Amino acid sequence: MKLTREFPSNYAMAQWQPSDHKDAQVIGELFAHFGAERFTIQNTRTGVPVVWLSRELLLDVMGFLRKLPSPFVMLFDLSATDERMRSHRHDLPDSDFTVFYHLISIDRNADLMLKVPLKEGDLTLPTVSRHFPNANWYEREVWDLMGINFDGHPHLTRIMMPKSWQGHPLRKDYPARATEFDPFMLDAVKQDQEQDNLLFKPEEWGMARGNENEDYMFLNLGPNHPSAHGAFRLVLQLDGEEIRDCVPDIGYHHRGAEKMGERQSWHSYIPYTDRVEYLGGVMNNLPYVLAVEKLAGIKVPQRVDMIRVMLAELFRIQSHLLFIGTYIQDVGAMTPVFFTFTDRQRIYTIIEAITGARMHPAWFRIGGVAHDLPVGWQRLVQDNLLSWLPKRLMDYEKAAMRNSILRGRTIGVAAYNTEQALAWGTTGGGLRATGLNFDVRKWRPYSGYDQFEFEVPVGANGDAYDRALVRIEEVRQSMRIIEQCMKNMPEGPFKADHPLTTPPPKERTLQDIETLITHFLQVSWGPVMPAAESFQMIEATKGINSYYLTSDGSTMSYRTRIRTPSFAHLQQIPSVIRGQMVSDLIVYLGSIDFVMSDVDR
């Protein structure tokens, strides 16, 4: 493993502003090859060029982007929007449903969003899974939740909802509250039907039940197996101990987080973000509030940026400590997990003193944070983290990472290269373990990360061992960032002085009746955001997390798209684990570092 210190300044993206990005290099390349008349460029606050095109052109454009000298190698996200109730669609193609494809070019450090308009009577698109294999699950999700078909898809079935589910929940005409449904009744007939739906039928997945000489075993790992790390089911096709193939089965933890975003105000949705990746705490608030602040045009004070960075890195450390302890436990060592949980308690002591809560503080606000740092917070950080954890990390390395059993179980196991990682949408430590230095905090700095001195740990082999090694070193780098926050915390307010800051600064409400009225409206009814689209990605605990928000000029989001890293990481499992042993699968699952709420949302 190596550390990267220097980063080319020309790769750091400028502050994202409302723009149509017509000057982007890729726009010129598309116009030159296909003709400008075949595209519509949308002006957004996403910071990304947004290009509308017809479905007939989609596959040709995808193939073209894949073959450019600096190609777009990752399908970062794929989802859809029900446009039928949207009021503010000025100068956009006529569309009832819109499918969008978010692509990333690593060589350019650039993004591109493609949008395809569809009419309600003809909701069909060609699959792009032959260009991007990770489109498989994303297209299944779009069909499941929006009802859009993808011709040529290898297995277009439900992925979040049960097989027996009626309707497509993310459509605007689908109820958003449980009270709008008839009472649920589980009689004997329905129970038998649901149990039959859960039976795995190999033929449906193109799997043989055996070869000429023997039958294969089909084994359910989960959804309640301790090594599955949550409500996650893997159906394994086994030839003895060898895994010939497997089918991941997700959705058991699905709670409709994106649908909830359509029924909560911009302010009251913040606690819901905490639960998307329940180990990340305020790390989940960050991309959401940054995206909302782009909509509102809010620039937060420097003190707010640094407070947010410090809290985000505290949660990164406690999440990585949980990973280290449970990963070593998966390999067979029991003792380290108790030490890592003890160390996590020290970090929670800091978090609770600052925010008032532990795992789910919901502490970030639109335009700032909930309140200022408490008196004596520096001593808490020093005593419970900076003076304690460095030595403990050395102990973990000696006891675990240099342990011959762990090394034997992990080195060379479940390895993949950078090209494969990008093809499956892998981000975070799982991508950097392959040798690629791609950390959003460095490549696309947000919240003032460009002001901090830290290095990006990078592996070399892309195996289960390197994925653990990278995360241990990331803990050290997070401590460096926190120490800089402690020494350089600027003075100033903890909220922006902006009309859409929610809640508004308290001292203003005590002097100005108009501000008090604004406070009442924004907290009870909710702030009204300008009609626009915004996007923000961050380097979260498990990989890149992002929020893509569509405002229709209301107190609530018209469409809240949450892209989580773990969804992509679990889709990659079959391609990595085929031909390996069941024991290797357990190690691989532990090395991914996922929680099912991050997958299922």
Swiss-Prot record:
Subcellular location as annotated: Cell inner membrane
Signal peptide limits: none
Q: Which cysteines are joined by disulfide bonds?
A: none
Keyword terms of this UniProt record? Cell inner membrane, Cell membrane, Membrane, Multifunctional enzyme, NAD, Quinone, Translocase, Transport, Ubiquinone
The GO cellular component terms are: NADH dehydrogenase complex; plasma membrane
- Indicate how the chain sits in the lipid bilayer: Peripheral membrane protein
Give the Gene Ontology MF terms in alphabetical order.
Answer: NAD binding; NADH dehydrogenase (ubiquinone) activity; NADH:ubiquinone reductase (non-electrogenic) activity; quinone binding
Gene3D superfamilies (alphabetical): Cytochrome-c3 Hydrogenase, chain B, NADH:ubiquinone oxidoreductase, 30kDa subunit
State the InterPro entries in the record. NADH_DH_suC, NADH_DH_suCD, NADH_Q_OxRdtase_suD, NADH_quin_OxRdtase_su_C/D-like, NADH_UbQ_OxRdtase_30kDa_su, NADH_UbQ_OxRdtase_49kDa_CS, NDH1_su_D/H, NiFe-Hase_large
What are the start and end residues of every segment in region (NADH dehydrogenase I subunit D)?
215-601
Question: Positions of the region NADH dehydrogenase I subunit C?
Answer: 1-191
Keyword Cell inner membrane listed? The answer is yes
Can you state which reaction this protein catalyses?
A: a quinone + NADH + 5 H(+)(in) = a quinol + NAD(+) + 4 H(+)(out)
* Keyword match Membrane: yes
Domain of life of the organism encoding this protein: Bacteria
- Residue stretches spanning the membrane: none
Q: What EC number(s) does the entry state?
A: 7.1.1.-
The entry's function note states: NDH-1 shuttles electrons from NADH, via FMN and iron-sulfur (Fe-S) centers, to quinones in the respiratory chain. The immediate electron acceptor for the enzyme in this species is believed to be ubiquinone. Couples the redox reaction to proton translocation (for every two electrons transferred, four hydrogen ions are translocated across the cytoplasmic membrane), and thus conserves the redox energy in a proton gradient.
Q: How does it assemble?
A: NDH-1 is composed of 13 different subunits. Subunits NuoB, CD, E, F, and G constitute the peripheral sector of the complex.
- Of which family is this protein a member? In the N-terminal section; belongs to the complex I 30 kDa subunit family. In the C-terminal section; belongs to the complex I 49 kDa subunit family.
Xref: HAMAP family? NDH1_NuoCD_1, NDH1_NuoD
What is the name attached to this protein's record?
NADH-quinone oxidoreductase subunit C/D
The organism encoding this protein is Aeromonas hydrophila subsp. hydrophila (strain ATCC 7966 / DSM 30187 / BCRC 13018 / CCUG 14551 / JCM 1027 / KCTC 2358 / NCIMB 9240 / NCTC 8049)
The lineage is: Bacteria, Pseudomonadati, Pseudomonadota, Gammaproteobacteria, Aeromonadales
